[in-house]
Amino acid sequence: MLDKLYITPLQWLRILRWTLYSLLLLLALLLQTVVFGGGRTLLGVQPDLVPVVIVCVCLREGAERGGTFALLASLFWHLSGAEYGSVCILVYTVVPVAGALVCRAMLAERFVPCLLTTLVTLFVGQAAVFLLKFFFEDLAGIYFLRRLLPCVLVSLLFQPVVYLLVRRIGKIGEKHEST
């Protein structure tokens, strides 16, 4: 029975690529919750790194495979205890997939479209969380300008590094790909 279990070199490369994407997501989750959590900040705010990884992987792998990764990663993010994670499941899946579809249809796979999609994803996610807090927890409106917009801008500082890592990881097994 075990003699029929054979994994081709192409399948090994795909397994390696998705394992590295998952490890990059776990690294972002670790940085966001442990290193920058608990009161420690970067330039006065806590960066939101998980959506940066999700967007970069989604744009690199396309709408179908990247969308599956985005859904699983945002679900994992919600299950790990993210505040208002249920909204993040929707936002961090729909916006990167829509960005991947637009980028594949009209734009080249480059850094600037990825940066803009990351900006839109972070802004929509932070705005959704702000609106929930504003309506249900009676949060002051100035919180949006003092905390959430700087959080989006600080999170964008990490996007070039994540983009380069995802681009390098995405080249694993690329010459064997027929798509």
Predicted regions located by residue number:
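Terminal, non-globular segments
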Residues: 1-179
